[in-house]
């Protein structure tokens, strides 16, 4: 992935699909290590606008700025990011967009889940309005149906009301991390056993 892998005790191979834009019609399946993905997620792209400028933009403008490419946490058939194209998932990825005042989702994740996990902030994130992504590696590849059930279960464990309703779709993409020139970036990692799906 272009960066040295993060050194982790619990590392291993997984498959993701990547593309340079959400609009891409050709996604590439890649075998990477958990440590390589962690290193990529720990290294956000800094964009030219300020946080205040970003916050006043229309949704279409925001969508263009935060589209720095992304990944799907599994393999796709024929390079297409559609529901029917998912072969399997290697990762659970959740959108945590509705965090109650004073709550820290990372504290909940480390207490309740207890497995390997990464939490990183989105382009729209701010300390007063946290918008975060949770990434959890799985002990084995899962089918799209298994993924939907598993991701809902994890969301239920950490607080389903914090998670976006569309986050359980197996073909859902996660943008690579980015932030405004003066924006905050948050990255947390827990080095542990991968989530046992059985």
What are these regions, as identified by a protein language model?
Residues 99, 181, 192-194:
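Short, glycine-/Ser/Thr-/acidic-enriched flexible segments
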Residues 94, 186, 193-195:
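Metal-dependent nucleotidyl/phosphoryl-transfer cores and adjacent nucleic-acid-binding surfaces
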Residues 41, 191-198:
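Long, charge-rich alpha-helical interaction segments
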């Amino acid at each position: 992935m272009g960066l040295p892998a993060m050194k982790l005790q619990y590392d291993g191979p997984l498959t993701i699909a990547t593309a340079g834009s959400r609009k891409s019609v050709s996604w590439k399946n890649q075998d990477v290590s958990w440590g390589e993905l962690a290193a990529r997620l720990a290294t956000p792209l800094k964009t030219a606008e300020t946080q205040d400028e970003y916050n006043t933009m229309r949704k279409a403008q925001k969508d263009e700025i935060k589209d720095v490419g992304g990944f799907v946490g599994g393999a796709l058939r024929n390079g297409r990011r559609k529901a029917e194209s998912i072969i399997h998932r290697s990762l659970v990825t959740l959108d945590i967009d509705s965090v109650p005042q004073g709550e820290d989702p990372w504290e909940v994740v480390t207490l309740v889940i207890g497995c390997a996990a990464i939490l990183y902030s989105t382009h729209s994130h701010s300390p007063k309005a946290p918008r975060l992504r949770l990434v959890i590696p799985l002990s084995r590849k899962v089918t799209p149906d298994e993924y939907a059930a598993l991701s809902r279960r994890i969301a239920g464990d950490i607080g389903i009301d914090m998670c976006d309703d569309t986050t359980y779709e197996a073909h859902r993409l996660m943008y690579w991390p980015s932030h405004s020139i003066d924006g905050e970036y948050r990255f947390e990692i827990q080095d542990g056993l991968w989530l046992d799906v059985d």
